[in-house]
């Protein structure tokens, strides 16, 4: 099982925090089909933080997938998902979105977001 964890960082204070996140999407999808996830954040000032996606396959360590900065146009994805993964955010709605296209066997898993 591959679990995606939504992380955020407090750059100003140099500490990590926890957010309340509600995920949707992530139902079973077919290979070659798109995977769409969304996370709703609450209680922290979402718009001023960069947001990371980190995944962990069963029995393996954490693996960084993507980051999206405060501005939607600034994002960076890991090489193995580049060109297939898009992240976006709506700061006014405290929402983060991720979509992966052209799923491969190694991508087939349950994705969740958590704080």
Curated annotation (Swiss-Prot):
Residues 76-113 are annotated as: Framework-3. Residues 18-42 are annotated as: Framework-1. Coiled coil: none annotated. Residues 68-75 are annotated as: Complementarity-determining-2. InterPro entries: Ig-like_dom_sf, Ig-like_fold, Ig_V-set, IgHV. GO terms for cellular component: extracellular region; immunoglobulin complex; plasma membrane. Immunoglobulins are composed of two identical heavy chains and two identical light chains; disulfide-linked. This is Probable non-functional immunoglobulin heavy variable 8-51-1. It comes from Homo sapiens (Human). The gene is IGHV8-51-1.
